[in-house]
Amino acid sequence: MVNRTVEEILALKKQRNAIILAHNYQREEVQEIADFVGDSLELSRQATKVDCDVIVFCGVHFMAETAAILNPDKTVLLPEIDAGCPMADTVDVEELKRWIDRYPYAPIVSYVNTTAEVKALSYACCTSANAPQIVKAVPFSSIIFVPDKNLADWVKKHVPEKDIIAWNGFCPTHHMIKKEDIIRAKKAHPDALVVVHPECRPEVIELADHVASTSGMVRFARAASQKEFIIGTEVGLLYRLKKENPDKVFYPIKKTMICPNMKITTLESILTALKENQYVIKVPEDIRIKAYEAVQRMLTLIS
């Protein structure tokens, strides 16, 4: 049945001139069928370089929105419309507008893990890989940083000269790692390097050997001479790490580090998306233009 589903997906993909993008946290079988696997911004940018009519984005809602922002002439499909992001959802747009009034001297730097509406209110966007670099490059001494308080704390450590006004959001999956989990994992695997995501709690980051985004973790594991790694991010990334580094061993800090929203998408929902042209993700043009400017400014600031 799985093989038949895969065959149907591949046939429809060819027929519709579509590409399938899968985030690093997706199910193994979804990663296997994807044309590209990566983090949200990498994937959206990849889509701009590929000659296609349809983008099937296997991820969560804000990621498909980002793809639509960067690819206005392409049809962007999100196979599971209920695949949301609790962290992105912490930002209430009306409350954010009140923050803009309260702190008129502080532009917004928004993590790409935000809605199109939030990006449209932002001076610049950032990723977990370039957040310190972006905040440092923004020509203002005070910054409103949304939505992740843990990433904001990580940025503060790298850019102490900036006043960072942080939104009180966090990723529930990364936030579940505690200091004790690191200590326990190190005790179980004393020869392994601990690599964690900057969305983790500050006390977890303090105990890590290396801090990186998912794409950064992939590069770090590939380049390191070390053979064992304890990975502090959603367990979906371990599939890619093991696949690309068969001679190395990867341990999850916690096997329960599963983002339920990232696991909703299945081969069946991808097939339905291509068959039924669902669910089309569109961003109103006035919002898209402003959000696009924030994403482009990020790229300009680090070029």
Swiss-Prot record:
Q: Where does iminosuccinate bind?
A: H23, S40, Y111, V112, N113, S128, H197, P198, E199, T214
Q: What is its EC number?
A: 2.5.1.72
Q: How is the cofactor bound?
A: Binds 1 [4Fe-4S] cluster per subunit.
- Catalytic activities: iminosuccinate + dihydroxyacetone phosphate = quinolinate + phosphate + 2 H2O + H(+)
- Tell me the route in metabolism or biology where this protein functions: Cofactor biosynthesis; NAD(+) biosynthesis; quinolinate from iminoaspartate: step 1/1
Keyword set, alphabetical order: 4Fe-4S, Cytoplasm, Iron, Iron-sulfur, Metal-binding, Pyridine nucleotide biosynthesis, Transferase
Q: Where in the cell is it found?
A: Cytoplasm
Q: Top enzyme class of this protein?
A: transferase
Regions annotated as coiled coil: none
**InterPro entries with a match to the protein in the record:** NadA, NadA_sf, Quinolinate_synth_type2
Cellular component aspect of the GO annotation: cytosol
Q: Which residues form the signal peptide?
A: none
Identify the residues that bind [4Fe-4S] cluster. C85, C171, C259
Gene3D superfamilies registered for this protein in UniProt: NadA-like
Q: Which GO biological-process labels does this protein carry?
A: 'de novo' NAD biosynthetic process from L-aspartate
Cofactor(s) needed by this chain: [4Fe-4S] cluster
Q: Which GO terms describe its molecular function?
A: 4 iron, 4 sulfur cluster binding; metal ion binding; quinolinate synthetase A activity
Similarity comment: Belongs to the quinolinate synthase family. Type 2 subfamily.
Function text: Catalyzes the condensation of iminoaspartate with dihydroxyacetone phosphate to form quinolinate.
For this entry, the protein name equals Quinolinate synthase
Organism (species): Thermodesulfovibrio yellowstonii (strain ATCC 51303 / DSM 11347 / YP87)
Its encoding gene is what?
nadA
